């Protein structure tokens, strides 16, 4: 599906977010520009799931804010997001079963029992519930309240909503567990610096590319957010994307120093261990890996791998 990550840093003064660029339309997937970061005011919205469903949720939020701009204040924004998510999810889950009767979910709750009778009403209710459980769309929303350090990392999904204030970071999508694992291993926390957090979040994104079904795209977007101050121009965005060149540097560091792999030195030892417990037999795969590992070790030590080492006489032949 995807991965979206957010982590507060500098004691809540900044938030670093990341996502991939993989889009899924039924059985078809492809990578384009990372369009999973959207803004409404200074709130950043990221989603995991179907783009069109996310658009429906955003439209509900926008309609609510037109009637009352305060619904997007720090005090009310979570309630607004949750209500919009629930409304869209309920409508989509009920539509296949109620639309043949020209009935909405509101109509069903009010008149369904009288209209259908208890037996059929309960069957329809179970069908709607089963359909709702199939939904896996998630939202991750970040921003600030009135306090300069009140960074909010808020998550909404099929199992409910969560506020990641204590940990300071959250992740959604199929790659979320891999992302969480890397953030925890790197000891990410709100007190981490901006530099450390950019690195940690990028590594969490790269690590998530090995998630279930390999459905996290390699294309990466990393954005640094900060709280708006009185000195900022009203129409100026309080965010900065990490450049593609810097993302390449981060991925190179990840590949060279942090990506999990069997070290060359370990490869030499484990090949011998396997041979000792397997009657001296070594698989062709292990032999090739062993040879290549030894070549790289020799290159590091400045030893030629073109010919085997042989002892040389130190006696003067003259």
How would you label these PLM feature ranges?
Residues 1-126, 132, 160-199, 237-318:
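Conserved short S/T/G-enriched processing/targeting/catalytic segments and their helical context
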Residues 2-8, 13-17, 133, 137-145, ...:
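Short beta-strand scaffold segments in enzyme catalytic cores
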Residues 11, 202, 206-209:
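Charged, amphipathic alpha-helical interaction segments
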Residues 132-137, 148-151, 164-167, 217:
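Short gly/pro-enriched beta-turn/loop segments at secondary-structure junctions
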Residues 144-160:
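Acidic-glycine-rich active-site phosphate/pyrophosphate-binding loop
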Residues 194-198, 208-223:
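Flexible, glycine/charged-enriched surface loops at secondary-structure junctions
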Residues 204, 226-228, 248-254:
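Accessory, usually C-terminal, subdomains that scaffold auxiliary metal cofactors
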Residues 231-237:
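Extended charged low-complexity segments that act as oligomerization/scaffolding linkers
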